[in-house]
Amino acid sequence: MTALGAMSGTSLDGVDAAVVETDGLAIFGFGPVGYRAYSPEERAVLRAGLGRWAGPEVEAAGDLVTRAHAQALAGFEGVDLVGFHGQTLAHEPRGRGTLQVGDGAALAAALRRPVVWDFRSDDVQLGGEGAPLAPFFHFACAKWIGATEPLCFLNLGGVGNLTYVDPSFERPEVPGALLAFDTGPANAPVNDLMQARLGLPMDEGGAVARGGTVETGALELFLAEPYFSRMPPKSLDRNDFAEMIGLVSELSDSDAVATLTGMCAAAVAQGMEHCPRPPARVLVTGGGRHNPVLMEMLQVSLDCAVEPVECVGLDGDMLEAQAFAYLAVRVARGLSTSCPGTTGVGALVGGGMVSLPDEA
């Protein structure tokens, strides 16, 4: 099948779109990609909805997400179905649940194609974390690149996600094939601080962090958070570590950004200790791989090669969008999308609902 996946991540930068050829098991090829950036005004609308479960801010964010995705996906042709993640505004798997806004039924009507959406709710309702959901796709990617030794995929978006893959197993559902969890905050605290202090959306190229020094006292307080002592699988909301900025409030701009960047790397290093076997390499995806300071910190902290996924022919900007294209096909075929090793759910779960164009 030819599937089009779309992802609007916690970094709030825009909509990624990508085509994957797959049967929901193997990857046969990758197709065209696209990107639709959010304007500063649109990012402000999304930020206003973060951490909320209902109300006008949530409705405004949902309308924006649906409209932006319709624009981002309209130009793709020859697509059998669409995988639509939506925008996560709130995520409390042990509390109120999970909320991704955006109307999949309206999107199906606009695109005149079936849309698979609401990927996380079933997993959470059945006791899982609802995240990460990309690991089944990461397993397929490991097979596609011909990996023979255990490896990790590290996604550095607003939140960091780690997937440990043992490609010696034939299927991702087999116990031991996958372990996945959120490592901790990644780009989100840096982006928020850059916006608040300097009016910039991110630390471009790690330039601000490069001029600073990591404050070890703040780093130690950060690593003492209970989340890091929990065994995986486990997941985070974008705002779970909002107090991080308070830990660096008295520091200079450069020291504050360097410290938040160091916190991301330290959280990954601590999370890697949970891997069943030492991975041969860590393949980094997401916006964080463009930050050379963060990549250097990771390489110093880890005992294996740390490389962008482009080193193996994958597209680090589009991997999550590709993941939801792949997962959409799995949903359409009645295959599972999460398992105990990825979200902690008690059994295999095939999440996601399908909206057809004539249902809207």
Swiss-Prot record:
Annotated transmembrane regions: none
Enzyme class: transferase
Molecular-function annotations in GO: ATP binding; kinase activity; phosphotransferase activity, alcohol group as acceptor
Catalytic activity of the protein: 1,6-anhydro-N-acetyl-beta-muramate + ATP + H2O = N-acetyl-D-muramate 6-phosphate + ADP + H(+)
Protein name per Swiss-Prot or TrEMBL: Anhydro-N-acetylmuramic acid kinase
Function per UniProt: Catalyzes the specific phosphorylation of 1,6-anhydro-N-acetylmuramic acid (anhMurNAc) with the simultaneous cleavage of the 1,6-anhydro ring, generating MurNAc-6-P. Is required for the utilization of anhMurNAc either imported from the medium or derived from its own cell wall murein, and thus plays a role in cell wall recycling.
GO biological process, one term: 1,6-anhydro-N-acetyl-beta-muramic acid catabolic process
Keywords carried by this UniProt record: ATP-binding, Carbohydrate metabolism, Kinase, Nucleotide-binding, Transferase
Signal sequence extent: none
Keyword Transferase found: yes
EC number: 2.7.1.170
Pathway: Amino-sugar metabolism; 1,6-anhydro-N-acetylmuramate degradation; Cell wall biogenesis; peptidoglycan recycling
Annotated ATP binding sites: 9-16
Superkingdom in the source lineage: Bacteria
Organism in which the protein naturally occurs: Ruegeria pomeroyi (strain ATCC 700808 / DSM 15171 / DSS-3)
Keyword rRNA-binding recorded: no
A Pfam family assignment: AnmK
Annotated family: Belongs to the anhydro-N-acetylmuramic acid kinase family.
